[in-house]
Amino acid sequence: MRDNIFTKENDLVNFAFDSQVANVFDDMVKRSVPAYQSMIEMISLSVKTYGQDNTNYYDLGASTGATSIALGINNPHSNNQIIALDNSPDMVKKCQQNLAGKIDNVDVICGDILDMKFENASIIVLNLTLQFIAPNNRQALINRIYKDLNTNGALIISEKIHFNDQQKQKQIAKLHLNFKRANGYSELEITNKRQSIENVLITDSKQTHFKRFNMAGFKNSICHFQCLNFVSFLAVK
């Protein structure tokens, strides 16, 4: 279904992952996030490299299930269980619908990431998720993920970032704006969505992410994918 949520000049409310967003999320993310499909493919590649037999894979902020599918399809390891978690009942419902008939080793759970226990985890993924968690809760979450990950397990985080250099930030923001225009979003839609989401999606810089990984205990962390202001990080325990 095509995303036309922000086509009208209505009173804007803060962006939320409700039924309206769940129904158009796949279209929204493909038209808003540069190289989104490549980002998903990199997750699949990382699982092949760092997944372990007889362990769990966690998809935190599972949304409509694209990451869980990447974790499950072409997985060369054996006896893995995927735990797909989202705190939006509407997203959980859509995720269950999308996963039906595609992968069967998955549990879809509605819950809060901050309350989740990670057991026997070789892979933990936050795909465009951490940016929606309150900044003052992020370090504690990454600390806990590091503690709970199996040795040689991997944390994969994909995020929108900002640049501390204002000139670079302006350049990349302009390119991202043109990306959205090229994908059919009008000026009204772009403006409305920005106003709706700006207090909900809080970005970090690359430097902040790497500092957070280091403070948690990760000694091996890299940015292994980037397109414009969207990046993926790989941190191995």
Curated annotation (Swiss-Prot):
Q: Which UniProt keywords apply?
A: S-adenosyl-L-methionine, Transferase
Does the keyword Transferase belong to this entry? yes
The record ties this protein, via InterPro entries, to: CmoA, Methyltranfer_dom, SAM-dependent_MTases_sf
Q: Which HAMAP family match?
A: Cx_SAM_synthase (MF_01589)
How it assembles, according to the record, is: Homodimer.
**Species per Swiss-Prot/TrEMBL record:** Ruthia magnifica subsp. Calyptogena magnifica
Please list the residues that bind S-adenosyl-L-methionine. 36, 61-63, 86-87, 112-113, 127, 194
Listed under catalytic activity are:
prephenate + S-adenosyl-L-methionine = carboxy-S-adenosyl-L-methionine + 3-phenylpyruvate + H2O
Its lineage opens with: Bacteria, Pseudomonadati, Pseudomonadota, Gammaproteobacteria, Candidatus Pseudothioglobaceae
CDD domains from the xrefs?
Answer: AdoMet_MTases (cd02440)
- This chain's protein is named Carboxy-S-adenosyl-L-methionine synthase
Protein task: Catalyzes the conversion of S-adenosyl-L-methionine (SAM) to carboxy-S-adenosyl-L-methionine (Cx-SAM).
- Pfam hit, one: Methyltransf_31
What the record says about family reads: Belongs to the class I-like SAM-binding methyltransferase superfamily. Cx-SAM synthase family.
Keyword match Nucleotidyltransferase: no
Q: Which GO terms describe its biological process?
A: tRNA wobble uridine modification
* EC number, UniProt record: 2.1.3.-
Where on the tree of life does the source sit, at the highest rank?
Bacteria
Any one Gene Ontology MF annotation carried by this entry is:
S-adenosyl-L-methionine binding
| PANTHER family in the record | CARBOXY-S-ADENOSYL-L-METHIONINE SYNTHASE, TRANS-ACONITATE 2-METHYLTRANSFERASE-RELATED
Which EC class is this protein assigned? transferase
